[in-house]
Structure formats: C-alpha cells, structure tokens
Amino acid sequence: MPACKDPRWAYGALAWLIFFVVSHVVLVFYPGDDPTDGGPWSLRAYVIFNVVLISVSAAGAVVVHATVRPWARHLPRWLLLPPLLAGSILLVIRGVPGMVENLLMVTGVRRGGFVGADDISTGEFWAGLGINTYFFLGAVLLVGTTVSYGRRRS
C-alpha cells in the first residue's frame, strides 16, 4: 500500500481506534476483580484514566474519518493535521519501544521485557507480545494516515 494519497491507511487507523475505544469501554464497565493490579491508585482513578483514553481516542477517530470523507474536504488543513501528528507521535512513542521489547522477549535477551521480571508466565509473555504488537500496528496505521493526508492535501 503506497503511502501517498491512499485512503486505506485512514480506514485501517479508524478500525484500530474503534477497537481501542470499544475495548476500553468494556474495561470501564467490566473492570475485573482488581483492575489497579495492587497499585497505589483507586478504582476511581482507573475509571477516569479509561474515560480520558476513550474520549481522546474517539476524537481521534473522528479526525481520522474526516481525512477521507467528502463532508470534511472544506475543513482547513491546520484543523486536522496537528491532531494527526500528535496521535502519531504518541503511538510511535508507545509502539516502537514495544516492538523493541518484543524483540528482546522473543530472542530471549530479556524475557520480561524492559522492566518485567525474568520469570514471567507464558500468559504474561504472550499478552505482552500481543499488546506491544497492537500498539505498533496503531502507530504504523496512524503515521500512514498522517502522511497520506499530508500528501493528499498539499
């Protein structure tokens, strides 16, 4: 998929964002036995954190969707490009180190990743790989969307 002027990046990023929002809505309503994992924060902080993530991601989904819809063609470039850049930067900051951590874990250099314990369970190992890959995919899709939008509108 060439990066320039291809709307498929935006549709991929939109699907990623929708899944992210839905998964965090589920986490708010069904937090499990101990969603704070014994941390110093309360259930209220956990819910507030997830509501902020849901709100920012839903706004991001609207922005991404606007990059490929006819109703948004009249919107000025400065309205859509900064949030796309900000989201891309955040996902790259989360996704790229996650993939480096995946490489460390898979090669056995550091089975627990950057800060994990050396004796993690198989479930924790695979969950870490899945989550890191998921965020890396989000970074790739949103960066592709940002580049595609930037080239389309120039």
Question: What does each of the following model-derived ranges do?
Answer:
Residues 53-63, 130-146:
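Hydrophobic cores of alpha-helical transmembrane segments in multi-pass inner/ER membrane proteins
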Residues 8-9, 26-39, 104-112, 151-154:
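Extended intrinsically disordered, low-complexity coil regions enriched in Ser, Thr, Gly, Ala
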Residues 19-31, 89-106:
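C-terminal TM-helix exit segments that contain a strictly Trp-centered aromatic cap at the helix terminus
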Residues 7, 83, 116-138:
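Individual transmembrane alpha-helices with interfacial aromatic-anchor signatures
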Residues 35-58:
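Transmembrane alpha-helix entry/boundary detector in multi-pass membrane proteins
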Residues 66-93:
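Loop-to-transmembrane helix junctions at the membrane interface
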Residues 2, 8, 67-73, 140-154:
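Cytosolic juxtamembrane helix at the C-terminal end of the final transmembrane segment
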Residues 35-41, 97-128:
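Interfacial non-cytosolic loop connecting adjacent transmembrane helices
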